[in-house]
Amino acid sequence: MKLVEKVTEMGLQIEMICPDHGIIWRKDPSKIINAYVEWSKQVPKRKAIVIYDTMWRSTETMAKAIADTLALEGVDAKPMHLRRCHKSDIITEVLDTAAVIIGSPTLNNHIFPSIGSFLTYMEGLKPAKKIAAAFGSYGWSGEAVKTINSHFETMGFDIIDPGLRVKYVPDKTGIEACQEFAKKIAHAIPA
């Protein structure tokens, strides 16, 4: 923001944006400058992103139940599978979202590797003003939720629920737990 303000004060006519990394903007650079100004403000919308990965589709079933319930509660909810969506696309969604909800199966007493990698990536970008919640499926130990919450704490997110864990495949009771979890998140998102 400070650099944008400084350039604006100088009255420079910007014709092109050439970053160290990324695409070169030759047309309408003011469009991207305005987008960066909005992104840097990190003003959250009534929106939730449900980021997840899954081994045997149990965590995916949870993610879909959570996203569907959020939508029914009037929240713009977007489920994003980490191995099907590029991390840059996911981070772009994180920029203006109010709630970051991450789901992971427990694998060898840890989070799924793709989730760990993404959390490290997100921590480096320092998103702010987020509420957060973790969920996941497990077979015998279930540490993934606790590990995700630890990352949320590091990022300064407001954890609104200790997390939802479902053993094995979500049955009717598990789906209902996902729905209640989502309703709690929806009520925590400012209107």
Where does each model-flagged region fall?
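C-terminal accessory/connector segments of nucleic-acid motor ATPases
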Residues: 14, 42, 52-53
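Interdomain/boundary linker segments immediately adjacent to catalytic/signaling cores
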Residues: 29-33
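Active-site-proximal loop/helix segment associated with metal-binding centers of metalloenzymes
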Residues: 1, 40-43
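Conserved beta-strand elements of the Class I
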Residues: 47-51, 133
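Short acidic-aromatic active-site loops that bind/stabilize oxyanions
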Residues: 52-56, 171
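Membrane-embedded alpha-helical bundles that constitute the cytochrome b-like, heme-associated redox core
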Residues: 34-40, 179
